[in-house]
């Protein structure tokens, strides 16, 4: 067990059902350690991967770490007419964590758009929702993104802070996805607070 896992109040995630939504951002590679940390903390993790995210990280990687098949679309078996029920997924979860949350996904969520399974689950979820934005600093500072994040907060969603640091573009500033260890720690703390 990692030092982080042994120092984290794992009991707060033990038995928790976490939907981890991964959207298209270079930070999608951080979904792998994030998934591992959530599982180590005792959570049952179901990963939802957007088509854009699959260009950065594979379903095989996240499925291996979560010990569950990764869901990438509405259809499970098109020939048989089997589909992934977004309503059931939204009701199953104790928390919906979207990390990374790209500018595109943030805009879709803020405006009630449903182009993919992740967005449909978001609109169906009755559980607390947590978003970890990840994009370049000018995108993060753009008024459209700022307004969309404010709107998501007004819906009761928690938006993690985006720390300053070196970005994939080589620029330095805010827009980075919060590190997986910090996300798991804050998620656990907020879920406990929600129950009190």
PLM regions and their residue ranges:
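A cross-family phosphate/adenosyl-ligand binding-site feature
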Residues: 1-130, 137-196
């Amino acid at each position: 067990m990692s030092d982080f896992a042994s120092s984290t109040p794992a009991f707060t995630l033990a038995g928790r059902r976490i939907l981890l939504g991964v959207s298209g951002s270079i930070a999608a590679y951080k979904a792998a350690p994030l998934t591992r940390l959530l599982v180590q903390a005792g959570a049952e993790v179901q990963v939802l991967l957007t088509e854009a995210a699959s260009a950065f990280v594979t379903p095989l990687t996240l499925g291996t770490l979560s010990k569950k098949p990764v869901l990438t679309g509405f259809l499970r078996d098109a020939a048989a007419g089997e589909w992934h029920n977004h309503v059931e997924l939204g009701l199953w979860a104790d928390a919906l964590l979207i990390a990374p949350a790209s500018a595109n996904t943030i805009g879709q969520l803020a405006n009630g758009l449903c182009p993919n399974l992740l967005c449909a689950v978001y609109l169906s979820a009755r559980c607390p929702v947590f978003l970890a934005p990840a994009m370049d600093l000018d995108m993060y500072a753009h008024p459209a993104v700022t307004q969309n994040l404010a709107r998501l907060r007004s819906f009761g969603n928690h938006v993690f802070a985006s720390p300053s640091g070196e970005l994939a573009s080589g620029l330095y500033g805010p827009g980075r996805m919060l590190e997986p260890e910090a996300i798991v720690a804050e998620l656990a703390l907020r879920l406990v607070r929600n129950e009190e």
